Amino acid sequence: LEENIDKFLDEIVLKVKEERVKRNISQLMLAQILGHKSPNYVAKIETRKHDVSYNLSHLYKIAYEFGIEVTDLIPHIQDSQK
């Protein structure tokens, strides 16, 4: 189960990064959207090596700023189990 959760979180990070890059939004700009001053916060999340991940408030802010639904950033559970 823990392995599936890690994969699920990895997929969320990947979806957010894909949407960020598609919109030419830098890590700094995304960090500022999330209320942080440094791009290091987003870099830590995107590398998934520091046990930091997006929370629901982050996903709401990202979806709002990107003009998409929160559900666009969340993978289907069945996809995460493969």
Describe each model-derived feature in a short phrase.
Residues 20, 31, 63:
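The alpha-helix within a helix-turn-helix
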